[in-house]
Structures are given as structure tokens and as C-alpha cells.
């Protein structure tokens, strides 16, 4: 699963790319149980906030 770290600027670039609906807030969040590891969020993020969970 991907997780979004504290460098998230909530720009919204990832939201339309995510097939499992990233949750919007002051920092965006990905539901680890729903994430399908597609990496679409990471490929469009301007600050590199989404990363594969260890």
C-alpha cells in the first residue's frame, strides 16, 4: 500500500488519478486496505509525498 507523508501540500493532483479514492483533508490520505499499489498517485505528485509502505 502507498502512504502519503507529511510533505503533502494537498494540491489535489493525486485525487483524480487514484482508482480507490484518496481522502481529502489538510494532508491527503490513502486507505491502506483499499490501496491497490498502482502508483498513480506517486507518478503525479509534485512533492513526492506518496511512497510505498514498508
Swiss-Prot record:
Amino acids binding [4Fe-4S] cluster 2: 18, 35, 38, 41
Gene3D superfamilies with a match to the protein in the record: 3.30.70.20
Entries under InterPro entries matching the protein: 4Fe4S_Fe-S-bd, 4Fe4S_Fe_S_CS, PSI_iron-sulfur_center
Pfam families for this protein: Fer4
Cofactor dependency: [4Fe-4S] cluster
Domain 4Fe-4S ferredoxin-type: 2-25, 26-54
Record carries keyword Transport: yes
Molecular function terms from GO: 4 iron, 4 sulfur cluster binding; metal ion binding
Sites where the protein binds [4Fe-4S] cluster 1: 8, 11, 14, 45
Annotated SUPFAM superfamilies: 4Fe-4S ferredoxins (SSF54862)
Keywords, sorted A to Z: 4Fe-4S, Electron transport, Iron, Iron-sulfur, Metal-binding, Repeat, Transport
Superkingdom assignment: Bacteria
Job of this protein: Ferredoxins are iron-sulfur proteins that transfer electrons in a wide variety of metabolic reactions.
Protein name (Swiss-Prot/TrEMBL): Ferredoxin
Source organism of this protein record: Peptoniphilus asaccharolyticus
Amino acid at each position: 500500500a502507498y502512504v502519503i507523508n507529511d510533505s503533502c501540500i494537498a494540491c489535489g493532483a493525486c485525487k483524480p488519478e487514484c482508482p480507490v479514492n484518496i481522502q481529502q483533508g489538510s494532508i491527503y490520505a490513502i486507505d491502506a486496505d483499499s490501496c491497490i499499489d498502482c502508483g498513480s498517485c506517486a507518478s503525479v505528485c509534485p512533492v513526492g509525498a506518496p511512497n510505498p509502505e514498508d
